[in-house]
């Protein structure tokens, strides 16, 4: 039988195509993939911009043809995937931008089973990935625990041998006479070893330095004319509550001292040695910077310079002293390493946390990380059709991609499940990624449902639906199991033989949970609120919001409303308790 590729020889075309200025229904019957993709690409533009094209598609069988393309299923072939994505985009454009009659025709063209299958596939993928991620995380924790226990035993053995050796050395050293006692001033607390030539360096005379508890003041020129000796004694003065006595030659300007710089005793005990360096302005001989011979551990957190601090008092700080410090550092040509200060950033407290961060940075694979997001303050009746979608069928994975013409829309974040499977490189996983529903497909499905579900006369299509066999991914999900044998191809059942026993509202309600993206949760909440609309054609009665019940009111205001959202109605307390598991996610106060 000849293919249905209508050629146009007079314009040198192998088949009939849809362009941005010409719509031809025959182009949708083309069996060749490439010209059909070109036609669908232009049709996606026409369905967005032309209301007449949307109306024509509802009467010439164009919508039915697009739905048939969708029901053929997705394939691993890139061209087939592109064709499916473009057809889906066209149907969404028709349903979202069309009138009530156009939306009714989209539902009557059997588009609801396609949406139900997409949502069900996505939920199954999430459950599968969450289960695998939890098992892998548990195995990783057991491995880390075993890895930590083994070095601990070896360290205890080495420590015991080292203690024995040191005790033997102490026994031999006790035979020597004790060393001569050397008097050390009480304000010197440096415990580090000093070079031999440091004894010849005379220490400057030290005046008793005290300061009030609130603020300490001293001359700002004391930093300027200090001699830059290669080695200084590091000391710290005890704080007292008196005004320091200073010479007039030291400088007349006074500079306020901040509490975070004046209280080194608040530092952790592990850094007392570093904190005892004379960097605080309360120490008269403390230098404003550290020399190159002072070794600071790499793992310590450097305190920002004084110019980055904000004043803790209402007065303005004088920056001349700080400028002179910066000039000294620049002119000396030596590296400036500030000592450790109070922790004001996100620090790592212990070795366990540090190792966890290092492991997370060095780990090249992506684990499942579900972000807890909420969507507050959104109106239930507000619709937004400006979410960006792939008109050309390409997969959008840009973290900073914003919705078109919508500044308030959050950025589209790549799915953590796609990142999880992308790093597990095997044949089964790569084939599964091609058939896995994308987040934009789920988002457009929920968006289309939000527009067509508000018509109560179409509610039976949503509550009595089915799944499309060629779109289901149960076989691909079974291939992801570890040690799974190849699944034999089973002859699929005909779709028209399947019973309509699927209610789409429970599937949509699962997307109102907080671990989904904000856009998904928003559109899912809109769909669920449409379920609570009253049917004007039946006298304004409402249906019980518990999908397992489905009872209708016999008269208006028979059922009681939810006290929180004042929108949903339940026929009894039992139905309300049964539905609260997911209703709490979309139960918003009016």
Swiss-Prot record:
Gene name of the record: samB
Ranges of biased composition (kind: Low complexity): 152-167
UniProt name for this protein: MYND-type zinc finger protein samB
Zinc finger (MYND-type) stretch: 546-587
Region (Disordered): 133-220, 297-344
PANTHER family found in the cross-reference section: MYND-TYPE ZINC FINGER PROTEIN MUB1
Pfam families assigned to the protein according to its UniProt record, in alphabetical order: zf-MYND
Disruption phenotype: Produces partial defects in sexual reproduction and suppresses an apsA deletion mutation. Changes the colony morphology and inhibits sexual spore formation.
Family according to the record: Belongs to the MUB1/samB family.
Cellular component GO terms, alphabetical: cytoplasm; MUB1-RAD6-UBR2 ubiquitin ligase complex
Sequence ranges of Basic residues compositional bias: 139-149
Gene Ontology biological process: establishment or maintenance of cell polarity; positive regulation of flocculation; sexual sporulation resulting in formation of a cellular spore; ubiquitin-dependent protein catabolic process
Keyword list, A-Z: Cytoplasm, Metal-binding, Sporulation, Zinc, Zinc-finger
An MF annotation (GO) of this entry: zinc ion binding
Keyword Protein transport: no
